[in-house]
Amino acid sequence: MSSSPIIQARTSTWRLIAYSLASIPLAMAALPIYVNVPKFYADVIGVSLTAIGGLLLAARVFDAIQDPLLGYWSDRTRHTKWGRFVWVAAGAPLLAAAMLGLFNPPALSANLMMWWLVAMLLVVYTAFSMLQISYQAYGAEISDDPVERTRVVSFREGFGLIGVFLAAALPQILSSQYGPREGYAIFALIFIPFILVMVTLTVWLSPAPQIRIATVSKGAFSNMLLPLKNL
């Protein structure tokens, strides 16, 4: 006999705001990777656009491979004390450090700079995926009510737009004031305390998940290959 779904109480607006705070630094990190990195490393650092394009492609392929693994491991930890937020809390300082390394590279030769760029891109993508996958999965578990889920996504994406605006405006403003190299370094330095504070507030103040999903079976790893059958 199947039980009817339980209608969850309306989630507090303040709790939704707390959950959505982490989407601001996530958006602040995502936009510069695609928009600012090519220009910064080509115009300021002196790496060829051909090399940058190849490195970005390689990093994206790596990201596509690791994302299902990170999702699988996130599922394995969701029933622990801190649940998925273990990954969110671990990814935040890693992403902060990687953004600083990406936009404040040391003085290196051209060949070593390419290795530095690919290393920073891999760390940025890994940290970003650690955060985003578990963060968005947590949001889906706050409620099973369609209306409440719409509120969760609306708050999260609305706050994400704030991050997009900051990511688009701050590097340009800082670069015009201090020069491109110093401007991007300052942007990365601002990003560090910002993401740590926002993620801490999200982890501590977010609404508790209401959906209890069955424990992942040992054979669940093979389920990641199921979407490939549709190709």
Region roles according to the model:
Residues 2-231:
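Membrane-embedded alpha-helical bundles of multi-pass transporters/translocases
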